[in-house]
């Protein structure tokens, strides 16, 4: 229910769910559903009812790699397999190229690259064996601190929500008690007004009867005088 003296956009909510009763009474749910259905029938949104919103930019977070993958999926092309050539160690050339220095040099360079790659992997494994355990412990401790902080924030939010619910409940119960008292006063005033009006009507009838009696007595006196 909107108030008449309110700022535009403000609404006075006259529902007191913590105080009102009768929601579970037979027919209440059906009546509410009927009101909702009636509102949905009267509300006919147009095709451009979202025209006041800005046009969505679906490509805001797209990258070139994502765009290429979307195009590949749209064209129903199979995914390109990873090249494993860099991990292969081909044998030295044979046949006509067994005396080709360039071919031998490529084979040696590939072998050196593979050897260096394996050496780096070994170093990484050694570093992991020395420091990986402590690094993992530190990482887990950071996760524990983050979880504890998040749980504290969650407890604060829950307490804030509970306090708001209690405040709302107290406000509604107070308002409901005042409304009930005002309703009782209104009923009492209406009853008193009814009694006053009935008494006034009775007095008016009595006055009318007295006037009639006085009028008849005056007429009788006049007749006797003549």
From Swiss-Prot:
InterPro entries: SPF27 (IPR008409). The keyword Nucleus applies. The modification Phosphoserine is found at residue 94. Keywords: Acetylation, Coiled coil, mRNA processing, mRNA splicing, Nucleus, Phosphoprotein, Spliceosome. It holds the Pfam family BCAS2. The modification N-acetylalanine is found at residue 2. Residues 139-223 form a coiled coil. It is found in: Nucleus; Nucleus, Nucleolus. It comes from the Eukaryota. One of its GO terms (cellular component) is nucleus. The keyword Iron-sulfur does not apply. Component of the pre-catalytic and catalytic spliceosome complexes. Component of the postcatalytic spliceosome P complex. Component of the PRP19-CDC5L splicing complex composed of a core complex comprising a homotetramer of PRPF19, CDC5L, PLRG1 and BCAS2, and at least three less stably associated proteins CTNNBL1, CWC15 and HSPA8. Interacts directly in the complex with PRPF19, CDC5L and PLRG1. Belongs to the SPF27 family. This is Pre-mRNA-splicing factor SPF27. The lineage of its organism: Eukaryota, Metazoa, Chordata, Craniata, Vertebrata.
